Amino acid sequence: MSRRRHSYENDGGQPHKRRKTSDANETEDHLESLICKVGEKSACSLESNLEGLAGVLEADLPNYKSKILRLLCTVARLLPEKLTIYTTLVGLLNARNYNFGGEFVEAMIRQLKESLKANNYNEAVYLVRFLSDLVNCHVIAAPSMVAMFENFVSVTQEEDVPQVRRDWYVYAFLSSLPWVGKELYEKKDAEMDRIFSSTESYLKRRQKTHVPMLQVWTADKPHPQEEYLDCLWAQIQKLKKDRWQERHILRPYLAFDSILCEALQHNLPPFTPPPHTEDSVYPMPRVIFRMFDYTDDPEGPVMPGSHSVERFVIEENLHCIIKSYWKERKTCAAQLVSYPGKNKIPLNYHIVEVIFAELFQLPAPPHIDVMYTTLLIELCKLQPGSLPQVLAQATEMLYMRLDTMSTTCVDRFINWFSHHLSNFQFRWSWEDWSDCLTQDLESPKPKFVREVLEKCMRLSYHQHILDIVPPTFSALCPANPTCIYKYGDESSNSLPGHSVALCLSVAFKSKATNDEIFSILKDVPNPNQVDDDDEGFRFNPLKIEVFVQTLLHLAAKSFSHSFSALAKFHEVFKTLAESDKGKLHVLRVMFEVWRNHPQMIAVLVDKMIRTQIVDCAAVANWIFSSELSRDFTRLFVWEILHSTIRKMNKHVLKIQKELEEAKEKLARQHKRRSDDDDRGSDRKDGALEEQIERLQEKVESAQSEQKNLFLVIFQRFIMILTEHLVRCETDGTSILTPWYKNCIERLQQIFLQHHQIIQQYMVTLENLLFTAELDPHILAVFQQFCALQA
């Protein structure tokens, strides 16, 4: 006892404080666990759990009110799939403690304003939906909710604002109606009719230039590719016609109607949508993905129609589950297959359709592509007797519709399918796809199979791929990924540079230095010597050919051998590739050596950019060069180009970040500076200001390179597409060839995948390249892109 008392005296009672803090933390953690887990599988009914939890929270309100408020606001934002469970809980708390209900509504409005200010529009939709469902729980008075929606729809009358801003407020209103439409119409039918009329008027006049760029398929058969607001409007119209009868939303508050209807309600404070600013970034429009209908599962429960509001609710809830649990594939899969009401719907079909809808979403999926692969694999493990069959059916449907599928989505389909096969011993009924063998190799189906097998080889090895596919598919199988060394056989003796290649080979094997290699290359004759331009003397194609061919041949054993070779003879590479022509020729020779190994080409280009042997513009020019024309539509070529663009973008962002950090550091120094004359601080400021000036120059230079890269890419696209269009017009043939479809959609892909960066250079692109004189087929792509954020 004395020791304990002595300890208290010395510590000023700190252990007691710590125990208090520890107890408080334990209680808070317990409350968080209870709130987050309500609605999960339990021996008791949901209603019983909600009533019990409301009692626990009410008892803890005196001590933990701010924590409970914060938790409930967070789950409203982050767990939208359990929306009605939490609105019921708030309703029960409001019935027991009116003041708490008022504070919660105020906190939600604050959170909504913060989300809109921070451009978190997806979360803001969930908050609006939550508030609207509180009307059903007698927490919020219906007239004040109608007033808020009136303010939302009034945004459609704003002038000089982007259409995507108006779209969001209309979507926030319409997407809440499956939950609260009936209640609002019963209380305020005239006002709701007026809002509906304004909404309809807006939807009729809004522009939809962007739609073709966002469609997964160019054809509307068998399922229309509807713009998201058009589809939702049709669903709400049908719901209204059906007298707001909706049969799928879980509504636990109905069990507590006698309690909730006695509660006092709160009026929402007047809500004015925050004005549009230059920093406002609204969600892009979407096209609704449809793959299945009721005919695809004739034996199971009937799938709701595409304009049924149940279809919207189911899909919305499944998207919410993926959004909440995507980082944990096992949990995510378990949550999806245990979806409430699963016995009333063909759940596996809905799950597969929703996953592919996200994977194929343009311009980009909500989550990293590989997540969808791992999630589908996990679902196949959880439901081995049913889900693999639905997935196979979906794969067959996608294959059958390849002719009209967006090239970007075909790329994702290739990557998903090859990765999926690698997890199931590459088993597939290839004979079912033998129709592709009679088609032109550039047609979508044989091209798809070829690219899938190429990707499968990356995940396996060449001989294994030959073994798993029928012999009839040999024309579509990838080539043996071996190095092609032009100086390697006897017939090469007469080739220019053959003797130098032999000398280089011996030197490389003897671990020669860069200077020794320069010495061997010194006397290689220059075919460009006759040129008058200065670059002709510096650019020696034969010297590059002999050096690159021989070095890559000797380093062909593995990726790491090739990387080591690039690193060891980096000085030679830099000297030979000093000019633009030199950089281009290094890439050409590398491609000749590894033309049968796309993966090696990709990693070597990546390494050459990182080590500054070649630059991004050189890679872009190489991709559009005549040497690559035979492989121009191959997937690996476009993976290289997109990787190159991403590297340039990262480079610019890195320097911009360094500049911002330097500016912040200078601002902190100014803030800390005392009133005294501190010459040391002046010196530090001077050094920092010089650093900022240098970084500013680097940023401007990098941005200039970035802009130039996009100008090169778009200029080359315009040139080759214009040549094709003129040739077709001259010959009197159709422009709609497989090559044209691939090329014009690759142009769309560049715009979509790098839209945030390209938007910075819109004025330059419009003034220099995408002018009114351009062919309408090409100009249409630019106009569709402009409409995405218009």
Swiss-Prot record:
Residues 28-240 form the MIF4G domain. Signal peptide: none annotated. SMART domains: MIF4G. Gene3D superfamilies: 1.25.40.180. There is a cross-link at K684 (Glycyl lysine isopeptide (Lys-Gly) (interchain with G-Cter in SUMO2)). It is found in: Nucleus; Cytoplasm. Component of the nuclear cap-binding complex (CBC), a heterodimer composed of NCBP1/CBP80 and NCBP2/CBP20 that interacts with m7GpppG-capped RNA. Found in a U snRNA export complex containing PHAX/RNUXA, NCBP1/CBP80, NCBP2/CBP20, RAN, XPO1 and m7G-capped RNA. Identified in a IGF2BP1-dependent mRNP granule complex containing untranslated mRNAs. Interacts with PHAX/RNUXA, SRRT/ARS2, EIF4G2, IGF2BP1, HNRNPF, HNRNPH1, KIAA0427/CTIF, PARN, DROSHA, UPF1 and ALYREF/THOC4. May interact with EIF4G1; the interaction is however controversial since it is reported by, and, but is not observed by. This is Nuclear cap-binding protein subunit 1.
